[in-house]
């Protein structure tokens, strides 16, 4: 803001109607109501008028281009002095500077993010947990990168809202340094895993061989279960066919009573033999599997 002492002298063009009665000295007053001192000819765009509410007298005010846009100073007859060259010198004791205060918001409200109640049940943020394993991938997923970008955007907006209190560049530098440190740790861990001694490689090979053996055993057990089911079905079909053939032959050669008795006894013996045969088959299969596992 400029002080009044900086605005003491304002040169203007000399007027043809100005009577040069003063030689070498400043006149104590310049008759402002008369047009003998035509000092405001070049500044009509800055002229304004004001009326004293107490006395009702008319005051001439002039908006200064050197002041702020909301400031102006009021002239009276005793506010300035004129010399022979037409220069005007303001009298600070008789000049009042007025300002109109403009209401300007200095502090801005912080932007608050309002989350709705339905967003709490949104599963889009947990897709990486639902569709992937926790320890499956060491590197960050795209959803995690988007989340980091969103948090950085919120931090920058908060910094722009409070530019006088916070340093946004330091925050962004911290984010970048943290990300670079994480990437360096990941690369160092991967290089450590790659550069293992030969003993570690042999241990990993033994583990792989054990895993392949267990997988083969599971495949063989599934194959054995399928073959066992087929054998049981085939054996039952053969027994049924044999019983039907024997019953038909007995009825043809013998009477009805003898055929029924023979058929019942045959069914009992077949059921006993079937259970005995199945128990023996299961015993031999379990022993064979145990020997295969030991090998």
From Swiss-Prot:
Keywords: Membrane, Transmembrane, Transmembrane helix. Its main location: membrane. Pfam families: TMEM71. It is found in: Membrane. The keyword Transit peptide does not apply. InterPro entries: TMEM71. The chain crosses the membrane at residues 229-249, 253-273. GO terms for cellular component: membrane; mitochondrion. It is a multi-pass membrane protein. It comes from the Eukaryota. Belongs to the TMEM71 family. This is Transmembrane protein 71. It comes from Homo sapiens (Human).
């Amino acid at each position: 803001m400029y002080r009044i002492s900086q605005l003491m002298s304002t040169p203007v063009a000399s007027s043809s109607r100005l009577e040069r009665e003063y030689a070498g000295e400043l006149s104590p007053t310049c008759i402002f109501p008369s047009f003998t001192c035509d000092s405001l000819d070049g500044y009509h765009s800055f002229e304004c008028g004001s009326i004293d509410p107490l006395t009702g007298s008319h005051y001439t005010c002039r908006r200064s281009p050197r002041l702020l846009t909301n400031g102006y100073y009021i002239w009276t007859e005793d506010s300035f002095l004129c010399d022979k060259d037409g220069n005007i010198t303001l009298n600070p004791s008789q000049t009042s500077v007025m300002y109109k205060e403009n209401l300007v918001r200095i502090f801005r409200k912080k932007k608050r993010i309002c989350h709705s109640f339905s967003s709490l049940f949104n599963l889009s943020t947990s897709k990486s947990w639902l569709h992937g394993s926790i320890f499956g991938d060491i590197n960050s997923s795209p959803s995690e990168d988007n989340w980091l970008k969103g948090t950085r955007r919120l931090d920058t907006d908060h910094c722009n809202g409070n530019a006088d209190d916070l340093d946004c560049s330091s925050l962004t530098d911290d984010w970048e340094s943290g990300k670079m440190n994480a990437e360096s740790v990941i690369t160092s861990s991967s290089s450590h895993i790659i550069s293992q001694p030969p003993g570690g490689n042999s241990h990993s090979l033994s583990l792989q061989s054990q895993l392949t053996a267990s997988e083969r055993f599971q495949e063989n057990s599934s194959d054995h279960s399928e073959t066992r089911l087929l054998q049981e079905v085939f054996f039952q079909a053969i027994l049924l066919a044999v019983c039907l053939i024997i019953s038909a032959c007995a009825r043809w050669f013998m009477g009805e009573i003898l055929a029924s008795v023979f058929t019942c006894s045959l069914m009992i013996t077949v059921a006993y033999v079937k259970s005995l045969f199945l128990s023996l088959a299961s015993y031999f299969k379990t022993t064979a599997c145990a020997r295969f596992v030991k090998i």
